């Protein structure tokens, strides 16, 4: 599964109300993603504070400890929100572990990069994670409820990737895969089939289901 290497892109955090508010998802889903992003933001701000404190003390980062910290805290948050990452949404457990490993790897490799432990980075991670989780759970819920078709939607602005622009309004059977550049995806933000960073990071596309 491809991992979103946020620090390798020129991504700038956008206020959550604007970031999600401009998307064509339902108002209830916008609110859910905003609340989810706020919780993820809090988690990573705490993480970055702990990492910064370790560095100030001259300690070498305990990679396993911090990866486990992210994984445990993230799963606790999902449980609090009633999101089942074991049976209903099994991809989440894999995603969380790999995302945690990638975030800590970046911090280990770039100890002098202040952005690695910044509030802006926490927001960028939160925005991407909230959309990834939102798109995945909406897809799985649509499958479970008997929906049979899905339509790819974009923001229709200059920030939309060319490979995503080509998919605007495309409707296909729900279990078929969208051809997105060099990759295949079940829905926007889907990395379960190996989609690369260039097709997922900062993406605000969404699917509708019928």
Model-identified regions with their sequence ranges:
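N-terminal leader/targeting and assembly helices and adjacent pre-domain segments
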Residues: 1-148, 208-210
């Amino acid at each position: 599964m491809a991992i979103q290497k946020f620090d390798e892109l020129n991504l700038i955090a956008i206020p959550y109300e604007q970031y999600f508010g401009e998307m064509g998802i339902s108002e209830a889903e916008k609110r859910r993603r905003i609340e989810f992003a706020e919780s993820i933001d809090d988690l990573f701000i705490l993480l970055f504070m702990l990492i910064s404190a370790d560095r100030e003390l001259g300690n070498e980062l305990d990679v396993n400890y911090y990866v486990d910290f992210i994984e445990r805290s993230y799963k606790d948050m999902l449980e609090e929100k009633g999101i089942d990452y074991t049976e209903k949404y099994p991809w989440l457990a894999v995603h969380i572990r790999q995302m945690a490993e990638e975030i800590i790897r970046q911090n280990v490799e770039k100890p002098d990069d202040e952005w690695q432990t910044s509030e802006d980075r926490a927001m960028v991670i939160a925005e991407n994670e909230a959309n990834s989780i939102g798109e995945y759970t909406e897809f799985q819920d649509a499958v479970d409820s008997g929906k049979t078709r899905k339509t790819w939607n974009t923001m229709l602005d200059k920030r939309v990737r060319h490979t995503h622009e080509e998919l605007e309004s495309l409707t296909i059977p729900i279990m078929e895969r969208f051809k997105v550049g060099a990759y295949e995806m079940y829905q926007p933000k889907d990395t379960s089939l190996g989609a690369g960073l260039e097709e997922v990071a900062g993406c605000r596309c969404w699917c509708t289901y019928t």
